[in-house]
Design a protein with these regions (language model features):
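Secreted, periplasmic, or luminal enzymes acting at the cell surface/secretory milieu
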Residues: 1-70, 245-336
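Short, well-ordered alpha-helix to beta-strand connector turns
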Residues: 197-198, 237, 258
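A short, aliphatic-rich alpha-helical micro-motif
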Residues: 194-195, 234, 255
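Surface-exposed amphipathic alpha-helices with a cationic face
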Residues: 17, 230-238
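Acidic/polar, compositionally biased interaction segments
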Residues: 31-198, 214-216, 221-228
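Short glycine-rich anion-binding loops that position phosphate/pyrophosphate groups of nucleotides
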Residues: 206-209
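Extended, hydrophobic alpha-helical segments in both membrane/secreted and soluble proteins
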Residues: 225-230, 240, 261, 275
Length: 336
């Protein structure tokens, strides 16, 4: 499999703001992060300059140098030309500029051994000890390791990452995230904003942290407080459009709550522009749904068959896979 970072990526908010003369306001609504996203722009205020060494300890001759735009290092074999397939270490240096003042949570997932310094102070030292197993790195990574740190908005500080492949197998590396600890009522902020707006667009869904290869989805339901967000915004504004951005079917028992629902899937780098085309009435969303969405989870054959026994799932519906299951059992789906 492969992942590609697009050359151009415009968010729906940016596209809507740039293409209309309307007053566009924004509220986060809720937090759906399964794990903390990697540090990147705008918090990452300079590229991560990484020196690789062909040893488990940092030092000596530099085997290779590389620049990264986000704190997400995952390697099958050699990270780059000149570096050993398995025995290596690296030192990465960059600067970060927090967007808000207050407590932040630094999070690490690793397959190997990692030490992180911020402003020349060791914040996480995960070079010794058992940190448990997580789902990331195809099940070879640790559970998230966390620490708190106070940071000031706009104050640029150095961050240094030290990593060793010692003790890791097959997939090596680390992912480092940093996010402010929210003390705001995000749902209330969204509800209040919707109440004083002419119309509301609520974008819900998942991301590659929830839907990815290498493991099953955790749940059939939208993560976080997204259903409550839909309900509260729809109650506050009768002209609410809910945009569902997921890679597969999710619970939609709330489908009659908003004024309109648009399912867009993971549409790629032109998602923002395409969505605005539809919202402004310039294009007709005339596509077909690739999957059937059950009216309730209990109507899905997965409810009966998953997770199975001894890591084996039996497809008990037999030939009635997909829409045939609902047709054969006269089950009216939420979305055909």
């Amino acid at each position: 499999s492969a992942g590609v970072r697009p050359y151009r990526n415009v968010s729906p908010l940016s596209a809507l703001t740039e293409r209309t003369n309307l007053e566009i306001t924004y509220a986060q609504g809720c937090d759906i992060d399964r794990t903390t996203p990697p540090i990147e722009t705008p918090i990452l205020s300079s590229p991560i300059e990484v020196d690789f060494f062909n040893a488990h300890s940092i030092g000596g001759e530099i085997a290779a140098h590389k620049t990264y735009s986000r704190a997400d290092f995952k390697f099958f074999g050699s990270p780059t030309k000149g570096v050993d397939n398995h025995t290596y270490s690296f030192s990465g240096k960059a600067t970060i500029t927090p967007e808000v003042t207050g407590k932040h949570e630094l999070r690490l997932v690793q397959s190997g051994k990692t030490r992180i310094r911020i402003n020349n102070e060791v914040i996480i030292d995960a070079t010794e000890g058992d940190f448990g197993k997580g789902d990331d790195f195809f099940g070879m990574g640790s559970a998230e390791i966390t620490a708190e740190i106070d940071l000031e908005a706009g104050n640029e500080v150095p961050i240094e990452i030290e990593f060793s492949s010692e003790g890791a197998i097959l997939m090596l590396g680390c992912r480092i995230g940093l996010k402010p600890i929210m003390e705001r009522d995000l749902l209330q902020e969204a509800e209040d904003l919707a109440a004083k707006s002419d119309a509301a667009v609520v974008i819900v869904g998942t991301n590659d942290d929830w839907e990815t290869e290498g493991r099953d989805r955790d749940s059939f339901f939208l993560p976080g407080d997204q259903v409550e967000l839909i309900e509260r915004v729809s109650a506050a504004n009768s002209k609410t459009i809910v945009v569902v951005n997921t890679g597969g079917p999710h619970d939609m028992t709330w489908i009659d709550t908003p004024n309109a629902v648009l399912n867009i899937g993971f549409a790629g780098q032109e998602l923002g522009e395409a969505l605005v085309d539809i919202l402004l009435g310039e294009k007709d969303p005339s596509g077909r749904m690739p999957t059937t969405v059950p009216a309730r989870y209990e109507h899905s054959p997965a409810y009966l068959n998953y997770p199975g026994e001894n890591s084996v799932v039996r497809y008990g519906e037999g030939l009635y896979i997909g829409y045939r299951w609902f047709t054969a059992r006269h089950l009216e789906p939420a979305v055909p």
